[in-house]
């Protein structure tokens, strides 16, 4: 394809709000253009990359007998009401009404639609298992779209759904999909690590995320250098190892703490270690207000609260609700009161005595607080995030942290949707049973960004061979010279038989062409320049900058050998 005919609006400067490296490079190299916050147009180069990613996904899906379909993006509210997610999903669900006042959503996922699709057709165990997938735009009303394609309001996704008669069949498909995802991310050039994860609003009993390692990643991965343990920090279990070092109980005392609210400020003011300060928080869980306690150097994990109580309805109490409950502001909140509120504490509070809590009075705290004497704990549990250096739950070593971008996730849904939506089949005994389901997603547009995050240098993108928009960037330095233009045109026609070629025939300075070439990042550059009359061109590899002059009658063989070694 001739570059003069392709829409590639490269930029010299990018908007200041483009924080992520991939966002800057995709804008600068002319692959995407923002329409509005969180919504982008994919320009020709990006479209070619997305097509290549999608081709690899389709090949791997077909290899495990997944069948492609295409479902509507516009979903009627009635389906979401059947599953219970219309009210539970929250403000991220993009809702709209038609001219008759009927409610719809722009789909962020398709569990409801696909369950509705198959429930009238899958009637016997003999029709199972079945796996369906699609590649389609999804929608989510993000509160704060950021990082370009990594957190947008419209995004391209591959979502697959499997249906089974028993758990063994689901397990087999889950493993097939897990392995297919591993192959997909390897083929597209991403270093992605599977980690144990939380199922979130989709639900289900078992799930893994595939995380592309990146400094800009919004998720923290907990891993071990001594085993294959890896988990999203939201799911990393904290194993309690008691270290009771209790001193004699001191007298409970209320002390003044003027204008200090955070645990760190309290520790500094009272000259006490941060881990002896106890933070108190109140959450509303399924409509009930419950108090939670963690030590000052730890952070409460809301995902673990949802898992512990088996609900998605967990939200922090508002300041007004806290005042109404215990007559205290959040900054002075503590567990010593005469109200009927359950108190749950993180396991590691069992190691403490003579600690510090809020006194439920502005500018005051209690010191020398002790559980059992001053207040009672309803139950202990693992309610916090693991910290770097703590022992891992598999006993393999200590927790290490890395940042990652979620590019895929696989779920065992079980019967969550089939039971609520009455999707049943007849088993081999003729008895009606709910379909057992799995679902599996890959963020296709997010994968595009993740590839760029991991494959670049100071000059621009370095595309992996498997997804590159073109194989070769053919550049004529000065197309006004007959020998260069003629040789460039001849090579373009010849190379197109074996490769996808982007032919820079523009009437631009050589420096502009080379800068754009580095920025766009095709694997190989072939330059027709001052030695064109001698039948010699320069061949340069993007990944390492190595270049060599090659006779044109040897070029075909040279490129064949070169591409064998390019990843």
UniProtKB/Swiss-Prot annotation:
Give a Gene Ontology cellular component term annotated to this protein: cytosol
Q: Its Gene Ontology biological processes?
A: prolyl-tRNA aminoacylation
Per UniProt, subcellular location reads as:
Cytoplasm
Instruction: Supply the EC number(s).
Output: 6.1.1.15
Alphabetized UniProt keyword annotations: Aminoacyl-tRNA synthetase, ATP-binding, Cytoplasm, Ligase, Nucleotide-binding, Protein biosynthesis
Describe the reaction catalysed, as an equation. Answer: tRNA(Pro) + L-proline + ATP = L-prolyl-tRNA(Pro) + AMP + diphosphate
Q: Which residues form a coiled coil?
A: none
MF terms per GO, please?
aminoacyl-tRNA deacylase activity; ATP binding; catalytic activity, acting on a protein; proline-tRNA ligase activity; transferase activity
How it assembles, according to the record, is:
Homodimer.
In the record's own words, the domains note is: Consists of three domains: the N-terminal catalytic domain, the editing domain and the C-terminal anticodon-binding domain.
Q: Family, per the entry?
A: Belongs to the class-II aminoacyl-tRNA synthetase family. ProS type 1 subfamily.
According to its UniProt entry, the function of this protein is described as:
Catalyzes the attachment of proline to tRNA(Pro) in a two-step reaction: proline is first activated by ATP to form Pro-AMP and then transferred to the acceptor end of tRNA(Pro). As ProRS can inadvertently accommodate and process non-cognate amino acids such as alanine and cysteine, to avoid such errors it has two additional distinct editing activities against alanine. One activity is designated as 'pretransfer' editing and involves the tRNA(Pro)-independent hydrolysis of activated Ala-AMP.
Q: What is the official name of this protein in its record? A: Proline--tRNA ligase
Q: Supply the source organism for this entry.
A: Staphylococcus epidermidis (strain ATCC 35984 / DSM 28319 / BCRC 17069 / CCUG 31568 / BM 3577 / RP62A)
Biological classification of the source: Bacteria, Bacillati, Bacillota, Bacilli, Bacillales
Which gene is transcribed and translated to give this protein?
proS
